[in-house]
A protein has these predicted regions:
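Non-catalytic connector elements of ABC transporters
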Residues: 252-373
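The feature captures the beta-strand-to-loop junction immediately N-terminal to the Walker
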Residues: 39-41
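Conserved ABC transporter NBD signature motif
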Residues: 62-70
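Conserved coupling/switch loops of ABC nucleotide-binding domains, chiefly the family-specific signature
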Residues: 60-63, 213
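A short, flexible loop at the N-terminus of ABC-type nucleotide-binding domains that lies
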Residues: 1-6, 12-25, 29, 73-78
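ABC ATPase nucleotide-binding domain
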Residues: 5, 29, 65, 344-346
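Helix-to-loop junction immediately C-terminal to a conserved catalytic motif
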Residues: 54
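ABC ATPase nucleotide-binding domains
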Residues: 74, 79-86, 90-236
């Protein structure tokens, strides 16, 4: 297994009207023996980054290290990596056993050892009973397990997966991602997993690297990414329903939502620059952190429910608030929320996220800057 270190990595493609930058100055370390997801929207550069780690693309600039080994110029077959792609590519006329063992075909491994390794990996992937069957006799999920087994049997230094579950049904995807996480922990294989699906990334990852326009927006554990987003892009990309962002003004320790008299008092430790004049910010609140209560005469934030999505254990209410351009999203376990009814909307000061209104960067207690004079 290996730690993957990317230094000042850049990838530029030639296009008819000039150049297209796919990866722009990526510096990061992917930890040994962990599962790290490269997460981002389509076109953000995550697959290009994975292909450079694999050796399928050559960096325009920068270096790639596996532990202390510079592998930037090393051919893909000599890097000690295994890769599983989105499309399941099994040999249709070979048995499951032969498909799995194919990963060792060009290595000098005794036949008895190969058989034992195939048996072991098939048992771990719960496909031992299918070893003598052909791929067309298997379900999509079983075929993907065979593809995983063929890659893992080589004991790779780094295991790379490019959206391997996107073509599978939802229930199969959920089951397979659980099995993959358990297997990765058991084998302690350094794993890099590309996905655009935030739910998969949150469920699978030890760490997540969020990419946008070829650059890293944030890297951290799923909890860090969700609870402490580095900017509004991360805050809006992670979490479903999407975070609410309100324009607000910070006056000392008082946070007031623009266009209303509704506000909250923040602790001085949460807002170090508490003595400043008013600062324009974006106030972020997760839908699960908002509360609905009957309309009152107080100066509260309020909105009228226009739609309730019934999702089972919790519902999502969408409210029209006169002071906002967008509907406010509230996740609630209450069953008595009615459409076309007005409610007060409240939240705990400890649940707010503050962002600079101009840059979108998170405002932390240790780096809240003074407003421009």
């Amino acid at each position: 297994m290996a730690k993957v270190r990317l230094e000042n990595l850049r990838k530029v493609f030639d296009v008819p009207d000039g150049e297209e930058v796919a990866i722009e100055r990526v510096d990061t370390t992917i930890k040994d023996e962990q599962l790290t997801c490269l997460l981002g929207p389509s076109g953000c550069g995550k697959t290009t980054l994975l292909r450079m780690i694999a050796g399928l693309e050559t960096p325009s600039e920068g270096r790639i290290h596996f532990d202390d080994d510079d592998v930037t110029g090393i051919q893909v077959q000599d890097r000690g990596i295994s890769m599983v792609f989105q499309n399941i590519a099994l040999f249709p006329f070979k048995s499951v056993r032969d498909n799995i063992s194919y990963g060792l075909k060009y290595e000098e491994v005794p036949k008895d050892t190969v058989k034992q390794k195939v048996d072991d990996i098939a048992t771990q992937l719960d496909i031992a009973e299918f070893l003598d069957q052909m791929p067309n006799q298997l379900s999509g999920g079983q075929q993907q397990r065979v593809a995983l087994g063929r890659s893992l049997i080589r004991d790779p230094r780094v295991f790379l997966l490019d959206e391997p579950m996107s073509a599978l049904d939802e229930q199969i995807r959920i089951r397979l991602r659980t099995e993959l996480k358990e297997l990765q922990r058991e084998l302690a294989t350094t794993t890099v997993y590309v996905t655009h699906n935030q739910e998969q990334a949150m469920a699978l990852s030890d760490e997540i690297i969020i990419l946008n326009d070829g650059q890293i927006e944030q890297q951290g554990t799923p909890d860090e990414i969700y609870d402490e987003p580095s900017n509004t892009f991360v805050a809006e990309f992670i979490g479903s329903p999407r975070i609410n962002l309100f324009e607000a003004t910070l006056e000392g320790t008082t946070l007031t939502i623009d266009g209303s008299d509704a506000g909250v008092e923040l602790s001085e430790t949460a807002v170090p620059e508490s003595g400043e004049a008013g600062r324009e910010v974006l106030l972020g609140i997760r839908p699960s952190r908002l509360r609905l209560s009957p309309e009152s005469a107080d100066d509260n934030l309020r909105g009228t429910v226009v739609l309730v999505e019934k999702l089972g254990q919790e519902d999502v209410a969408f409210l029209d608030c006169p002071v906002f351009d967008e509907e406010v999203r509230v996740e609630t376990d209450r069953t008595d929320i009615e459409e076309e009814t007005t409610y007060d909307i409240s939240f705990d000061p400890d649940d707010v996220h503050l962002f600079d209104r101009d840059t979108g960067e998170a405002l932390r207690p240790d780096k809240a800057a003074k407003p421009a004079q």
